[in-house]
Amino acid sequence: MSHRLLKTTRRPLAAALFVALIAPGVAFADTAKEKALEARIAELERQVQMLVNTSQQQQTQISQAQTDVTAVKTVQAQQPVAAQVPAGKQPIQVTTITPGAAPGTTVKIGGFIKADFLATQTSDGQLADDATGRALYLPGQTPVAGAGGSGKRSDVDYNAHAKFSRFNLGIDNVSDAGNKAGAFFEMDFFGNSLGNQTATNTYGVTLRHAYMYWNNWLAGQTWSNFMDAASLPEAADFVGPTDGVLFVRQAQIRYTQGGFSVALENPETTLLTGTRNPITGAWTNVASNSDRGALPDLTLRYGWKGDWGTFGVGAVVRQLKVDNQATGADADKIGGGLTLGGKWVMGSTDTLHYQISGGEGIARYVGLGVTADTAYDVARDELNPTGVLAGYVGWRHAFTPKLRTNLIYARSDYDNDGSLGPLVTKSVQSIRGNIFYTPMPKVDIGAEYMYGVREIEDGRKGDINRLQFTTKYSF
């Protein structure tokens, strides 16, 4: 009994001793886990704080960037809106090339290199060596027997030159207020008097255009406002329909509003004075110019344009004047004329070019000066303006986008004063056909045949045949 009691008593004691022995270990283990857990929590809290700090910095940077963008947009909104530039027309520079130019100034360089190869034959005599008519068609220079011609057919004369190559420079500016200003300059190498064909074929630079503009105003040298350059058909020749075309460049002041333009242009009077030898009966005509005009030539033009083409009407009123104190010549007259013409787009492959002009005292404007504006009658000391009727028509047909042809007819007739006699030009006319091939953009290769006739007052005629090849690279 006592033994069983002792045994029973020992079991709780053993259990108590066991608990007492392992309790510190258990407590120690719990404390270590808690510390490790606390350390991990602390590390997590540190990382969270770092993320919070980083997020705050990024938010600050984003806010600053948004502020900067807003400021830039505000500045851009205050600047003038730049004009939309068509594809392929982007400027080569962003900043101004010319240091002295106003901000926003653009510079454009252009022109072409043109080489011409001509074979010419005339029926009634030779064109003089280095004559202008050897390089381009001048209908007034076509020889006629008794009027600058021998009456004998010439041999074929061959000429080659590159003097019609040209270079131009355009400068344009639009101010913050929207005002437009700029200038244009163009030259070629048609200075015949400064060169020859002996060794280097050096020719002088000649001025074609030199003008400035400001909004609706233009001042300087360019095409006459009386002329419609846009209606000219394509030709290998320098002009093409020379016989019947208005073709003048001169200094002027011009105002343009929409399709209307008015200009005051440089005056110049061309004269012919006829004399008859009382013994032989032979007539001679002496050409001269007079820049004694007191009034500028007044020109007006109105034009329309659309998908159908272009059409315009023009007028000129001018003073014809001679004033030479040495000879005692002192006379003046009023001359004037009208013109209309344009370009009719007949379809995707065909275009019709046309012009008709008429008046008295406007011969200087027609055909590169086929004859004079007026006759000067020495005996009466008076001017008798020359009447003129001129025109041309040209048809253009495109076989393909790279191959095209032109057929052109031009003519002008003159009503001359009787004091000039029978040797003055009565009419000129020509017909030409050409073909052009464009193997790649800006490159043109062409061939052209031309036949022209000049008739004088007594009915005699002389003709000219010309075959011309041309190459051109535009830039």
Regions found by a protein language model. Give the residues of each.
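Outer-membrane beta-barrel "beta-signal"
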Residues: 437, 463-475
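N-terminal periplasmic/intermembrane-space "pro-region" immediately following the signal or transit peptide
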Residues: 28-128
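Detector for outer-membrane/organellar transmembrane beta-barrel domains
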Residues: 306-425
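Solvent-exposed, glycine/polar-rich loop segments of beta-barrel outer-membrane systems
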Residues: 125-146, 282, 325-329, 367-376
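Sequence/structural signature of outer-membrane beta-barrel proteins
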Residues: 120, 190-195, 224-228, 233-239, ...
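Outer membrane beta-barrel
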Residues: 95-135, 139-273, 292-305, 310, ...
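Gram-negative bacterial Sec-dependent N-terminal signal peptides
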Residues: 2-28
